From Swiss-Prot:
Function as written in the Swiss-Prot or TrEMBL entry: Component of the ubiquinol-cytochrome c reductase complex (complex III or cytochrome b-c1 complex) that is part of the mitochondrial respiratory chain. The b-c1 complex mediates electron transfer from ubiquinol to cytochrome c. Contributes to the generation of a proton gradient across the mitochondrial membrane that is then used for ATP synthesis.
Organism from which the protein derives: Urocitellus armatus
GO CC list: mitochondrial inner membrane; respiratory chain complex III
Protein name (Swiss-Prot/TrEMBL): Cytochrome b
UniProt cross-references to PANTHER family, sorted A to Z: CYTOCHROME B
Amino acid sequence: MTNIRKTHPLIKIVNHTFIDLPAPSNISAWWNFGSLLGLCLAIQILTGLFLAMHYTSDTMTAFSSVTHICRDVNYGWLIRYMHANGASMFFICLFLHVGRGLYYGSYTYFETWNIGVILLFVVMATAFMGYVLPWGQMSFWGATVITNLLSAIPYIGTTLVEWIWGGFSVDKATLTRFFAFHFVLPFIIAALVMVHLLFLHETGSNNPSGLISDSDKIPFHPYYTIKDILGVLLLILALMTLVLFSPDLLGDPDNYTPANPLSTPPHIKPEWYFLFAYAILRSIPNKLGGVLALVFSILILMLFPLLHLSKQRSMMFRPLSQCMFWILVADLFTLTWIGGQPVEYPFITIGQLASVLYFTIILLILPTVSLIENKLLKW
């Protein structure tokens, strides 16, 4: 009798994805973040579902409903803070996952990579809309500032912004539609994840050496299921430590003040995971230029397959590229720090230099260094 695992139409798909999947024998802990992102998405959808049962998307009651969740709902505080800090964990895993892809040349799987970049955009949009829902000061002003950026689009800008707002300012209509989109987008993300995996399993996983590993594959289960469980335990440990000991560490105190259109906070800034892009946006004095730089700072990821001029796929044996990669990482940390600082000297200058360095490393220095390394191979 044949195993149901290998014959049943539905179970067969699960089998080919998580059990009998041939995986390279040498993939490191950097390959754990895909499964961790899946876990983060599951946590966010579950906690979000329970929050949506008690939340009201009305400007008069939104802030009070979040307070009610934290004070009166059974373990509401836990659900709310798991959702808020779960978003931070989601982005930490996302950045590490993308960084792994850049370092080991995983972007040469074009379809998988491009779906991944689209996923990054959709997750960022979802997180932005979620930040607006508690209707605190930073929610309101963050929504006002970021949606207003679209007015920089020539000719249709102003109409587009008013269309998104559903009026002449961020108000009840905006909050309601943001809630609707914030609810539905995670399910679209889940569908995109399926497509992401579909394309990945067409080619098989990359590995740290960047070499073809068809001759040395091992089954996903039990080797990588056990390895993933370790990652899962560490992620849950980190998340619950944050939630139970310092739930407001990554939040903004201004968001504990109800939204007031008549009082602008002294420093409007997004959540920490958007600060690097926000710093790039602010480093350009022109509004349209800033918006284009903001979009391109993420969209540039799609150019990596075209900018790959090295004869080797991975950076494992390319010390010059490694050096530039870690300078790029340091530059992103600098941009994140600058994004949270007020717009004044010397932060403006540092932000502009860091922004120029970001684009220069990706568009110019990394490809040039790759060509130099190709020459060194002949010595």
